[in-house]
Swiss-Prot record:
Domain LRRCT: 580-631
Species assigned in the record: Equus caballus (Horse)
Origin organism lineage: Eukaryota, Metazoa, Chordata, Craniata, Vertebrata
Protein modification: Phosphorylated on tyrosine residues by LYN after binding lipopolysaccharide.
GO cellular component terms, semicolon-separated: early endosome; lipopolysaccharide receptor complex; plasma membrane; ruffle
Sorted UniProt keywords: Cell membrane, Cell projection, Disulfide bond, Endosome, Glycoprotein, Immunity, Inflammatory response, Innate immunity, Leucine-rich repeat, Membrane, NAD, Receptor, Repeat, Signal, Transmembrane, Transmembrane helix, Ubl conjugation
UniProt signal peptide: 1-23
A Pfam family that the UniProt record links to this protein: TIR
Domain spans labelled TIR: 674-817
InterPro entries referenced in this protein's UniProt entry, alphabetically: Cys-rich_flank_reg_C, Leu-rich_rpt, Leu-rich_rpt_4, Leu-rich_rpt_typical-subtyp, LRR_dom_sf, TIR_dom, Toll-like_receptor, Toll_tir_struct_dom_sf
LRR repeat feature ranges: 55-76, 79-100, 103-124, 127-148, 151-172, 176-197, 205-225, 227-247, 353-374, 375-398, 401-423, 424-445, 449-459, 473-496, 498-519, 522-543, 546-569
Domain LRRNT per the UniProt entry, residue ranges: 24-54
Gene name tied to this protein: TLR4
Record's protein name: Toll-like receptor 4
Amino acid sequence: MMPPTRLAGTLIPAMAFLSCLRPESWDPCVQVVPNTTYQCMDLNLYKIPENIPTSTKELDLSFNPLKELGSHSFSNFPELQVLDLSRCEIEMIEDDAYQGLNHLSTLILTGNPIRSLALGAFSGLSSLQTLVAVETKLSSLEKFPIGHLKTLKELNVAHNLIHSFKLPEYFSKMPNLEHLDLSNNKIQNISHEDLRVLHQMPLLNLSLDLSLNPLEFIQPDAFKEIKLHKLTLRSNFDSIDVMKSCIQGLAGLKVNRLVLGEFKNERKLERFDTSALRGLHNLTIEEFRLAYIDNYSSKDSIDLLNCLADISKISLVSLDLGNLKDFPKGFGWQDFELVNCRIEGFPTLELTSLKRLVFTSNKDMKSFNEVKLPSLEFLDLSRNRLSFKSCCSEADLKTTRLKHLDLSFNDVISMSSNFMGLEQLEHLDFQHSTLKQASDFPVFLSLKNLRYLDISYTNTRVVFHGIFDGLVSLQVLKMAGNSFKDNFLPNIFREMTNLTTLDLSKCNLEQVSQEAFCLLPRLRVLNMSHNNLLFLDMLPYKPLHSLQILDCSFNRIVAFKWQELQHFPSSLASLNLTQNDFACVCEYQSFLQWVKDQRQLLVEVEHLVCAIPLQMRGMPVLGFNNATCQISKTIVGGSVFSILMVSVIAVLVYKFYFHLMLLAGCKKYGRGESIYDAFVIYSSQDEDWVRNELVKNLEEGVPPFQLCLHYRDFIPGVAIAANIIQEGFHKSRKVIVVVSQHFIQSRWCIFEYEIAQTWQFLSSRAGIIFIVLHKLEKSLLRQQVELYRLLNRNTYLEWEDSVLGRHIFWRRLRKALLDGKPWSPAGTADAAESRQHDAETST
């Protein structure tokens, strides 16, 4: 053992050495992009790491206790373009802290409690475009030393302590400023003097966000003649009177987009009156957006729309419009959005100048009403759960100019016409709506100009081969999640010579016609994933001279045949074969070698695994050894024979093991009394019936029966098979078998049933009671031959969910369970008395 003095002499220098080590000297940063992007987030760094290359362009140092930034703190990174210093506990930034960062375009200082900010703190940032100083305890824009940042485009100082909206003179030196975020500050009043800079030097592209400021007063004419790109005022007003006064204070403003309203979780107005918006007449607005305003009547809804009559673009989000059936006519709207609003029924629309209508995710929608929109070019009616009794033609929409139609995520759409009068359509989306009669006739015959079609997950069953006739200009076709007759893909793409993208995933396809893709010379992307293809016959893909991406993942592909590999499109750049059932056997040696040779072509080739033979299941396909296929036939034959013999012996031993367990149990428990009246065999899918009906009526009835249930009576930590035999069969007088569709499809249930047969043979007292829970198809029942024969030869109980049927069922079942049960009058009386006592207590 080392003497104490010697041990201390060894440990003290080691501890001194370790104490000198800093986390930054351990190279803890994550290299996202070599020599370019590094992430050092939340590594407890106390200073800027020195081991990061000087070529770094993006550096994330957020959530490190840097405390302060001294002069030339980042001089080692002259190429830096993005710097994130969020929540680094920075309290002081000295002069020239960022000196030398001539290429820095984005600087993020969010969440730093800055107390001292030198006048030259941001010097040297000659290319800075985005500065984020959210939650930095900034109290005034005038004290923010950024007047020299002439290239600045975005300034975000939200969630600070700014009380004055006065824009400093240095804003006149920022001609490129496009976005100023002052939201969630302490601004209450806005005067003409505050905006003097904008009066002197207009910033025409400036977007100004003043949301979540407790505005109380805007001086009249403060915004007069000012031009803004966007102004956002959300959750600013405590009362409708303040809102009305402030909107009147905006008189004379010229703004491309005005956003008013509240936030979903920041509601201040107790009520809303559309009179507050009347002051909008004094503004010049191109686009208006109102969000999260409620608590007003249907009349107010009409008044609201009347207030917006002179605006060309309207967007209403998350409003309660109530019973607004008839929209006002004669408005000059060109663009109208109604998103996530509650409105009782689809409104009648007659707007002659409207070109774009977005009506999505609205509540209380049922059916679509005809509209009269002669100038409409863009129509989005998605996510409304609408039903369309007739679709689609000029008669439904009263327009011939439509180019974009989105009816996705709705209810039932009946295809009654082939888009007569809508020949200008270029984009059509039906995904996740239920299409009816879509495969009865050439429904798309008139759409010569259509370029995009999505009928994914529309419950379409393709029977008619001319379903896509007429789509001569189509470039993208998505039809995932549908089905084909006999799970066979025929030649239904006969006129789509311009098609570039085709999605046939999740269509249950098993075979592909040799001519399926023969007329698709421009196809570049083909998705055949999540189907049931057993062999990938490459002959149908041979005409696809432009194919670059082929996805055949999640199929049941065993292999390719050697002759099929010769038909591979030479243009193919990516082939996805992951999640298939590859056979790693010598019969497909050529294919397995081809996989090794095509590693660059195959997606995630290292994840291709063998499914058969069993001894190679889960092994990488790349690990298959071709040398094993050269062994002599004698060795192969002998090996196969040995494997078969071992397998047979193993099966016999397995079967014999359970017979021994049963036989031993019968000898052990044969003379004693059984603990349980019956062991219940059932599928876990039928557990609700077992718990709520079987257990309740038998264990709580008179006389009570004790059932053995796996979820309650099996011993934890013991193998399932051992529990079934020792706790289930050996300790029970009888066995109840609950037969259902789930039972027949469950391997565990069939295993328990087979053991029950052996148990009945070995035990003279044993009895099996069959309960058929639901009507079973004979084709399904014949899958279990012994069970089918047994049910034909023996009586069984059949569950009927009716008063008479239940009475007969429980009477017959109790009679069967009483057979051989030791009689205990006292126990029966006690049970009856207990039931009577419970009934009186509940009363």
